[in-house]
C-alpha cells in the first residue's frame, strides 16, 4: 500500500445525514441530472431480488461430484458475536464494505447499502458500532445493491462509490459529506462495483444490461465497455480484478464466467488516453473502447446463476446457488494463466467449499485483506468461515458462526483490514459484528 492510499481514512469524518444529489461541476456528459430518469427502466417496479429460477440440489449429476472430499476440519479462527443493530428502513441490506485504504491506528470504518440508503459506521474497540453518516437518495425507488471504497489521489480523502437498481453510479466524499459526481451509462441496474487494486481511479461496474464498464473517475471518462458479440447474454452479477489489476473475471445469470485482459496494448493505451483527456481543450468526446470478445469463457463450472467471483492468486473462486464455492482455474493444471487462449475449452476444478441452505441468488462471499480467510453467510443467518492458509484447497478448515437472533439471509460479509472484525448484513436490515478471538 502506498502512503497516499494509507492516508485516506485518517481524515475525521463528520457525522450527519445527507440527501444524495450531485454537485454542479461534474462532467455534464456523464452526470447530467436530466438523464437521471432515463435510467430507471423497469427498476422501480421490482427492487427485490427474485427467486432463483431452478433449485440446483436435484440437478443431474450433482450428488456425487466431489462428495466426501470436503469434510472440513476445525478452523483455527474463532469469532464472537459482540454487537448487532437494525437500520430503520426495514429493507434488505445488500452490500457492506470496510474501508481498507486506512492506516494502522485509524478507526475501522465500514459502509452498508440497502433501500435508497448509504450508511457509514465506525467499529469501536469495546464492541460498539457507532453511526457516522447516513445518505438518502432523492428517489425513493432507488435501491442500492453495491458499494466500493477508494481514495482521491490528490487529497487522499476516502471516497465511496455506490450503485443499484437505477443504474447510476454515485461517488460520495465522506469528508465533505457530498455526492461529488455521478455517472450515467448503464441501461439498467448495477450489480457490483470494484476499484482497481493499483489505480484508485479505475472503477469497474457490472450490470443487468449484460455489460461491464470501466470508468476513470479522475477525468470522468468511460474507458471501455466489455460486452456484445461474445459477451454475457444475461445480467452480469459479479466481477473481480486479479491482484495486479491485469485481468478481470466476470460472471452472471448466463451461467458463464469470462476473462477480460486489461494489460493488452489496446487497453493500456485506452487507460493512458483517459488520463490525458481534457474536455476543456477539445470539442470531441472521449472515445470508449468496445470489447466484444473475452480472452476466455466457460459454462462448465456451474449449472445456475453465478453470483460471486473472486481471484485467489491465479485461481478463481466462484459460487452459484448450489451450496458450494468452487475453486478452479482456466485450462489444465499445468497451464500458465497468461498463456490461456480465448479458444481454450478446458477447466480444472481444484476443490469445493460446501455449505448448506444457500440456494437463493445474490449472496456474496468475501475474503480478508491477506486472503487467508473466506466468509459466506446463508439464507438462515449462519456464517461460514474457511481458513485458506493450506497448501491444498481440499484441506481448507471451516468454522460455523451462529447467533440465535440472526436468522435472516446474510447478503454480504466484510472483514476489517486487520481481520479483527467481521461484519455481516442481512435481509431484515440487521448488521452483525463478530470480533476475532486472538
UniProtKB/Swiss-Prot annotation:
Keyword Chloroplast: no
Alphabetized UniProt keyword annotations: Chromatin regulator, Nucleus, Repeat, Repressor, Transcription, Transcription regulation, WD repeat
InterPro entries: PcG_WD-repeat (IPR051243), WD40/YVTN_repeat-like_dom_sf (IPR015943), WD40_repeat_CS (IPR019775), WD40_repeat_dom_sf (IPR036322), WD40_rpt (IPR001680)
Gene name tied to this protein: eed-b
Reported function: Polycomb group (PcG) protein. Component of the prc2/eed-ezh2 complex, which methylates 'Lys-9' and 'Lys-27' of histone H3, leading to transcriptional repression of the affected target gene. May play a role in neural induction.
Pfam families linked: WD40
Protein name, entry field: Polycomb protein eed-B
SUPFAM superfamilies in alphabetical order: WD40 repeat-like
